[in-house]
């Protein structure tokens, strides 16, 4: 490929084919090349781990960090990416020291050139891309569990196995089972993260979260990392500083060990793709703990901080010591708003309710089962996934708005910002709109579906349940593979289908799982209710 770069891992990729000069996400060619070099080094490390008995927790931790750093909207800093690649190569040299001085290198532990992948036969490229991008998504979940002290050797070893396979000359018949295996391992990884979050922060319970911003100094925290939020809440306690969540951090309010802090006040803003407008005049610092960071505009760049694997050139970074003093001092310096700010969601709502994870929902299992049997609840819709800037995403707003009053809408991840401030009322004494949580809380949605299937003594595909999903980045890929691993059929996916799905691979998914693209809300609702 004769391009400055090549990347087609996210939903917004240029022309639905691939970014070749600059990423739609905002990364430049230099950053894309650094990500490819890091990925190539990770594949080299996986090759070394395959031959060395000394591979262990330190090896897997580097793989997890490296994969997470290449996720969309995480790391835009070539220097940071190159430094991480250097650490990866140093670990490889530790595992196979003789390879560094070999006079006749065999290439079995060498770095992989990603140009080989991007230029491969389209079906091979498609399956390897599913494997690589799904691994990046799963690594994000493994990272969040890891920082809480929870690890799973099966998950970590599989990531190495997947990276190794990307660098091999394998056939479709060899790659396809590994792609589907990733879905099963990711289910195990999401279960690990669910265990980590609930044991560290308590089981989520439903809570109303206001969009109002009170006067005085405050900090906005974006991303997914609950551990970082907890540390910030501890360090700001008693300082007269309020903390507001943003984006995927919203479900943090439902965890008892987080909501016990009275200065965790509410949620600021709408979905991640609106941040450049919403942060423009913000009199407060913003801390990014994970994706989705967009290139900050000059109007607010002096107020943005990063931590963990997130990085952007010239932005201050909070290191592993997690001393948030610079963020706190900036909040006090900026001072916040002088008067209360009454903000709304995209549909005019002044707040939202979150916290309907599997424990909270299944506590009402008997009531739900009876409501289905009596006909009070006709159908469940899982409308969730990533949000993004593509115009067609208003489909999800209209789909939810048009769901009949005898149906329940389950939602999760940042796609909910399209409709989570709507008042859909109640059905059978339950809210019609149930926000399960972050994208990794797809695990909760799966547990709810499995419990209902057990109650009705049927398979998940036989339930009055339809999945209408939106995707943007690589965590959506591993979740989709998990649903396929479970044999779930008739998923509606949008707003566009992944550019990395070749016609043959897409046809396989259609034939075996009946995956279909979204069309228009009215037609899809009629079809799904008819089924």
Q: What are the residue ranges of the model-derived segments?
A:
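Long, compositionally biased, glycine/small-hydrophobic-enriched stretches that function as flexible linkers
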Residues: 2-216, 220, 240, 247-250, ...
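Anaerobic metallocofactor- and corrinoid-dependent redox/one-carbon enzyme cores
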Residues: 2-20, 27-31, 35, 181-531
């Amino acid at each position: 490929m004769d391009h400055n770069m090549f990347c087609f891992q996210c939903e917004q990729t240029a022309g639905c084919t691939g970014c070749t000069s600059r990423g739609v996400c905002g990364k430049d060619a230099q950053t894309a090349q650094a990500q490819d070099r890091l990925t190539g080094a990770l594949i080299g490390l996986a090759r070394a781990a395959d031959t060395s008995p000394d591979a262990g927790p330190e090896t897997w931790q580097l793989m997890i960090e490296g994969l997470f750093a290449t996720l969309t909207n995480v790391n835009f800093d070539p220097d940071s990416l190159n430094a991480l690649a250097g650490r990866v190569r140093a670990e490889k040299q530790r595992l196979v020291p003789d390879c560094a001085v070999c006079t006749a290198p065999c290439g079995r532990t060498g770095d992989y050139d990603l140009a080989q992948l991007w230029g491969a036969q389209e079906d091979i490229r498609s399956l390897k891309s599913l494997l690589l991008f799904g691994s990046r998504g799963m690594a994000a979940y493994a990272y969040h569990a890891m920082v809480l002290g929870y690890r799973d050797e099966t998950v970590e070893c599989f990531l190495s196995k997947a990276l190794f396979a990307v660098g091999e000359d394998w056939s479709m018949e060899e790659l396809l089972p590994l792609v589907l295996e990733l879905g099963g391992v990711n289910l195990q990884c999401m279960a690990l993260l669910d265990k980590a979050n609930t044991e560290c922060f308590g089981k989520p319970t439903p809570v109303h979260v206001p969009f109002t911003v009170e006067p005085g100094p405050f900090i906005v925290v974006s991303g997914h990392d609950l551990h970082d939020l907890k540390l910030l809440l501890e360090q700001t306690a008693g300082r007269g500083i309020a903390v507001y969540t943003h984006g995927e951090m919203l479900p943090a309010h439902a965890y008892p060990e987080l909501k016990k802090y009275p200065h965790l006040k509410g949620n600021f803003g709408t979905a991640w793709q609106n941040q450049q407008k919403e942060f423009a005049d913000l009199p407060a610092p913003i801390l990014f703990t994970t994706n989705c960071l967009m290139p900050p505009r000059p109007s607010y760049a002096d107020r943005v901080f990063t931590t963990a694997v997130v990085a952007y050139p010239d932005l201050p970074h909070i290191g592993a010591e997690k001393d948030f003093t610079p963020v706190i001092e900036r909040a006090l310096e900026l001072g916040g708003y002088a008067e209360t700010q009454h903000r709304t969601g995209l549909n005019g709502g002044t707040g939202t309710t979150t916290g309907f994870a599997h424990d909270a929902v299944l506590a009402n299992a008997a009531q739900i089962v009876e409501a289905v049997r009596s006909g009070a609840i006709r159908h469940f819709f899982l409308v969730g996934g990533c949000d993004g800037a593509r115009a067609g995403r208003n489909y999800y707003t209209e789909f939810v708005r048009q769901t009949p009053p005898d149906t329940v809408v389950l939602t999760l991840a940042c796609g909910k910002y399209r409709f989570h401030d709507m008042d859909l009322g109640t059905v059978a004494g339950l809210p019609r709109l149930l926000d399960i949580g972050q994208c990794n809380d797809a695990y909760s949605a799966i547990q709810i579906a499995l419990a209902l299937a057990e109650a009705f003594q049927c398979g998940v595909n036989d339930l009055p349940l339809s999945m209408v999903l939106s995707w943007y980045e690589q965590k959506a890929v591993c979740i989709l593979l998990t649903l396929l691993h479970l044999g779930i059929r008739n998923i509606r996916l949008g707003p566009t289908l992944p550019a990395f799905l070749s016609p043959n691979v897409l046809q396989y998914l259609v034939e075996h799982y009946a995956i279909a693209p979204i069309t228009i809300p009215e037609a899809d609702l009629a079809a799904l209710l008819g089924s």
